[in-house]
């Protein structure tokens, strides 16, 4: 695990729940962070991002005025925000796939389910710092590239050989002989 200089990082934590902001702030302080700015809704979160130029935004998904998904979209709009490359970690009590996909499609860098643990938060922060994803722009999206790395040397039974769905292997149909 790479060591992170938390004392050199600036965070904005946007969450409408004061108790959750306090938990995240306490964890960040325990990691060594000195600069933490808080916001109680999406609008003040965007203002804090513009005012403090953080290194990372940690945002709840459900907040008043506009939620974490809308906040992420606003930040990822290069014409609307000065920090479109800002790493964004979405926190949510909603762990259903549709919420994870919505956050990903809005341009979130990471998704973390509540209740949050110190280890999980540290790993997400470490990932956005040590292993940042390249950004891509399409007609409908600007944000971290969510495509997975394809290892050309992998030759397992689930290896895709082309772009067509006919090459997708159904694990239930694979018979491996010993």
Briefly describe each language-model feature range.
Residues 18-37:
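Two-component/phosphorelay signaling modules centered on CheY-like receiver
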Residues 130-178:
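CheY-like receiver
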Residues 63:
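Receiver (REC) domain active-site loop signature in two-component systems and cognate sites
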Residues 109:
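Short, glycine/charged-rich "phosphate-handling" switch motifs in NTP-dependent
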Residues 38-56:
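Acidic, metal-coordinating helix/loop segments flanking the phosphotransfer/catalytic sites
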Residues 98, 116-129, 133, 137-138:
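C-terminal output helix
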